[in-house]
């Protein structure tokens, strides 16, 4: 088996690694002396307050008789319990990821017409530049999906004529485009990985304008593009708790 010289670990590297390790040790006592919060945790394991936000909150304790006790976790977006939002999508027969994205970005739940227009806007942004899939995603595909996403997002910079414009309208435009494109970048990257590294058949389905984010993921992921309404609803529900993390990734 031949070794790529670009990736070869030589004896010199082994020696230098040991030198680097020896000079990178810090006396644990110094953390206590200077009150350093390792891993943003107090010595008792409690998280350190480093900022304030009105966007989301996680409640994992309850006050009982003046003492904090562990409790089933509750996630809140802009003051709304995520469980209530999910229940509302079931009652009103709409998808929740787009609704939560609107809520997180603009601070309120959208009216039906606002949600329709917002979903339409995301759909219109769900188009990759010409030859992007062939030239960027399909060439030298990575085994690491997060690496694939990172490379794709960084490369989109080269296709953006206003990449360095930090005005609020332009940054919002970039955020909405990335939110719209993440199903394509992630699934196409996965298809390239499966084809080049696992020998699977390669297929690329274009997104459908009438589909939600969850529906498009299933549509472009499956060879026959088939999925059930229940599968789409379950995936949409799974996307809701990670929508804030996804939003933070674009900040």
Positions of the model-derived regions?
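Beta-strand-enriched accessory nucleic-acid recognition/scaffold domains that flank the catalytic cores
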Residues: 2-23, 165-172
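Proline-rich low-complexity regions
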Residues: 110, 129, 182-183, 249
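Phosphate-binding glycine-rich loops and adjacent basic patches that engage nucleotide phosphates
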Residues: 53-65, 76-87, 111-116, 139-147, ...
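Conserved small/polar residues in nucleotide/adenosyl-binding loops
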Residues: 245-251
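An N-terminal structural lobe/cap that precedes and organizes the functional/catalytic core
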Residues: 11, 15-16, 21-132
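Glycine-rich, mobile lid/loop segments that gate access to catalytic sites or pores
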Residues: 136-244
